[in-house]
């Protein structure tokens, strides 16, 4: 794999040898190293990478990052010694393919992205109201009817549908290939079959397993739907166990995600079968029916030597300590679960939802809500071990995960834009025990843009850091400077509201002054990268307070 990467990225060909030689790169397997730890030593005439199998892979990734992206035939790396191991055992990224189907080739590319930066888990969100994406051979109706929708809501405005058929699914053969591809890159794939809510695609194929009997169609817009699985229908459990049995054959992961989020109970309140089950089990509230369902599915998975994971609503289902809780509605669910002795994966909306805007919604591609903004600096500031988790329970925080929900991410190019550079920040907080300053992080991380350019990967060009200093003499003058962390990048700006790409002045590290006496002033700037790639227009308004 290392030789292939060097050939593809640098047009360098290396020969393999079983003996140590000068001017060679040696990978030495040593099981005494920590599970994913490694040692990388660069000498004048030799490079040594030591570790177990996973550690060797991560040592290789570090070595590749040390090679300048612009390097040609003569590659030079200064001598150094690195001893490294991860902070968290679970370092993940989730991709929602339920809203939009991404090709098997792109799924492999996504795995390349995360593995290159030492993430080791791909949470594959395979089913949704908007699409069923996994072939189940016993029930071909699931993909025949559930994998396709008539159109898609493409904007938050009412009635903004494209009326274009959309869909797709992964065959079991494709899934096996992807699982094997990931394993070679030290990535475990955790499949998610979301239930008992977010199941309109399934109910389109099996309306009799709902409380009303349907008919249904695969969802064309976004939001929480009232129609969910009928918990009181015994036939439901046979279908769910059949589906999971095929899923377990495809995915060797010890963890299986069953969703469990956003499950309305309105239909259960009016359903004779659900009310009968409620009475039979001695339950008092419809919400407890979800607990019955989750515990029953958990027992089935345990019988197959698998462990259940669910979104943090599952914590309310009186589940056993073996269930992993994924905290998403803020951090409170994860804090509570860890203090109870549950293993926890932290992925709160406030830090780890990478479908959220990266900057000003006015100049960014459309996102889920104008109120939802998670810039790069906020991602980097996150600490998955919240201070409200008691010290003795810190060990229950398995790790951290970034989530890519795709309601408005309709293309691979836009998905790449949402991935980078926030993936760099996620990778660092997941791996590194110590934390750098944000400026230090940017100086290191932004060097990776050369690699993305070289491999034709899209990314968001970050805005400059603006250092402002208001006048203290009552003159209402605002002075500011701008900093950027990419060698050769250029900043163009205006302070009169005009387009900086057309009319902007090139910033030369000078102090820029704004007189705010006459009302609000607008700073607009763009960044032009050495590759020629240009940022969105960054807009900041200033006024006298």
Model-derived segments and their meaning:
Residues 52, 93, 114, 189, ...:
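Conserved, mostly hydrophobic/aromatic
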């Amino acid at each position: 794999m290392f030789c292939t990467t060097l050939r593809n990225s640098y047009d360098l060909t290396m020969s393999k040898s079983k003996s140590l030689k000068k001017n060679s790169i040696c990978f030495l397997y040593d099981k005494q190293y920590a599970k994913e730890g490694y040692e990388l030593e660069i000498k004048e005439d030799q490079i040594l990478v030591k570790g177990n199998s996973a550690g060797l892979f991560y040592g290789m990734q570090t070595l590749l990052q040390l090679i300048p992206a612009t390097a040609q035939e003569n590659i030079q790396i200064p001598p150094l010694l690195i001893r490294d191991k991860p902070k968290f055992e679970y370092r993940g990224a989730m991709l929602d393919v339920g809203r939009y189907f991404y090709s098997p080739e792109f799924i492999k590319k996504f795995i390349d992205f995360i593995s290159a930066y030492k993430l080791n888990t791909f949470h594959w969100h395979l089913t949704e109201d908007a699409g069923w994406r996994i072939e189940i051979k016993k029930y071909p109706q699931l993909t025949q009817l559930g994998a396709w929708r008539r159109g898609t809501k493409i904007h938050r405005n009412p009635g903004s549908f494209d009326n274009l058929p959309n869909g797709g699914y992964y065959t079991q053969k494709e899934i096996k290939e992807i699982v094997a591809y990931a394993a070679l890159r030290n990535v475990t794939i955790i499949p998610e079959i979301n239930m008992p809510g977010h199941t309109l695609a399934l109910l389109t194929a099996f309306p009799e397993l709902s409380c009303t009997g349907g008919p249904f169609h695969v969802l064309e817009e976004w939001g929480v739907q009232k129609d969910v699985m009928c918990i009181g229908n015994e036939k439901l459990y046979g279908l769910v166990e059949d589906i999971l049995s095929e899923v377990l054959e495809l995915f060797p992961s010890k963890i299986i995600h069953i969703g469990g989020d956003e499950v309305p109970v309105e239909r259960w309140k009016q359903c004779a079968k659900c009310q009968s089950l409620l009475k039979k089990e001695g339950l008092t509230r419809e919400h407890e029916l979800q607990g019955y369902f989750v515990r029953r599915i958990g027992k089935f998975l345990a019988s197959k030597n698998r462990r259940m994971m669910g979104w943090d609503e599952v914590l309310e289902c009186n589940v056993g300590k073996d269930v992993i809780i994924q905290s998403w509605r803020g951090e409170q669910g994860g804090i509570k679960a860890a203090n109870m002795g549950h293993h926890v994966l932290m992925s709160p909306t406030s830090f780890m939802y990478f479908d959220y805007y990266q900057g000003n919604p006015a100049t960014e591609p459309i996102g889920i809500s104008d109120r939802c903004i998670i810039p790069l600096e906020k991602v980097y500031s996150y600490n998955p071990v919240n201070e409200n988790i008691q010290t003795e329970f810190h060990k229950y925080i398995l790790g951290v995960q970034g989530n890519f929900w795709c309601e408005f991410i309709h293309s691979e190019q836009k998905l790449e834009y949402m991935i980078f550079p926030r993936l760099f920040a996620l990778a660092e907080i997941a791996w590194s025990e110590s934390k750098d300053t944000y400026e230090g992080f940017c100086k290191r991380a932004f060097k990776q843009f050369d690699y993305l350019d070289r491999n034709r990967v899209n990314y968001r060009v970050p805005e400059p850091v603006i250092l402002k200093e208001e006048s203290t003499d009552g003159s209402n003058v605002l002075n500011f400077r701008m900093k950027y962390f990419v060698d050769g990048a250029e900043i163009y700006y205006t302070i009169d509201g005009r387009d900086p790409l057309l009319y902007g002045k090139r910033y030369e590290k000078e102090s820029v002054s704004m007189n705010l006496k006459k009302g609000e002033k607008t700073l607009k700037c763009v960044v032009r990268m050495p590759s020629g790639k240009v940022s969105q227009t960054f807009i900041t308004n200033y006024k006298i307070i």
